[in-house]
Amino acid sequence: MTDDAPTEQTTGDNVGDVLDVLTLLDEVRTIAQNGLQYAENPYDRERYDRLLALASDGYGDLFDLPPETVRERFAAEVGHATAKVGGGAAIFDDEGRLLLVERADDGTWGLPSGYVDPGESPAETAVRETREETGAEIEVVDLVDVYYRPPGQLGPHSLVSLRYLCERRGGDLTTSHETTAVRYWELDDVPVWHKDHEGAARDAYEVWRAHRQP
């Protein structure tokens, strides 16, 4: 499950400023991490390290986190800085209802999904996250689409997310520490969607319908 949105609510008066700051911080972080990956000159490395520290301070102020904690997380991301990659599953029953999870952190409803672990494909992520969040065992049927979210839009980092049409093969539906409810929904009846999941869900419904055509 992924959720890297700001901890404080933004209003119409300041949301534009927050997005601008997040975009700037993401660019500074990327320059710093890529510089530390490739620079050999010790003076250049010192400058890039300072840039990373400044970005850490900015993220810390914005998300109310200790800058040292942010710095440690950035330092753990070795190699060339890239966008986050996620995988998610859309599982429909025979009546066209979609399996969704109610998130424990904000009470919204969304597709089982999460970040790709090292050595894992996005499709494998969709299967794993569904098992962890719902208890269901699934099989990937088709790729619905690839979605891109720029930094500052519903989260601080760039995100490339692959959403898959899947079929349930077994398992008993159950909640986890990340979810408070698991159930099938008619798309138009979902009370509150999580972030941008509604668009992906409706795209998946069209793919599901196409697969059911004789």
Language model segments and positions:
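Nudix hydrolase/Nudix homology domain
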Residues: T2-R50, L54, T108, H177-P214
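A detector of low-complexity, intrinsically disordered, Ser/Thr/Gly/Pro/Ala-rich segments
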Residues: A5-Q9, L98, E132, L173
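General structural signal for alpha-helix termini and helix-helix connectors
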Residues: N34-Y38, A76, R149
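Acidic, metal-coordinating catalytic segment for phosphate/diphosphate chemistry
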Residues: Y43-G88
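N-terminal strand-loop-strand
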Residues: V70-W109, I138, D142
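Residue-level signal for pocket-adjacent positions within structured domains
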Residues: H80, A104-D106, L111, R168, ...
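Conserved Nudix-box catalytic region and its N-terminal flanking loop in Nudix hydrolases
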Residues: D93-R128, E132
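Unchanged
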Residues: V116-V140, Y147-A204
